[in-house]
Amino acid sequence: MEQYWGYHTMLDCRACDIESIKNHDNIYNFAKSLVNAIDMKAFGEPQIVHFGEGNKAGFTLVQLIETSNICAHFCNDTGDAYIDVFSCKPYDRDVVRDEIIKFFKPRQITVNYIERQA
């Protein structure tokens, strides 16, 4: 099997539980739990900041990991979430999906996955 430089999972999560995506502590706990669940090493604390206006407003999460990053944006109005996991260390995409379901309860998840190699 060819070894790739990186693995990138992009999850578009429709109609999450609104209260869960507007809750700073829930997003923080998600970041901590996901890092552990996919056996990564966090580099510092997650950065979670509320950004945007109108239908773009919501929390943005950035969690640096030793092998790259976990990023997410949560939309207050729709309950949608856009979550990316990028790492040069392989991880289980199903575990990522399970963690999202546990913390945000989306009605639907569309998963796109690419293996990165320059």
Per-segment meaning from a language model:
Residues 1-118:
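Polybasic/polar functional segments that serve as interface/processing modules
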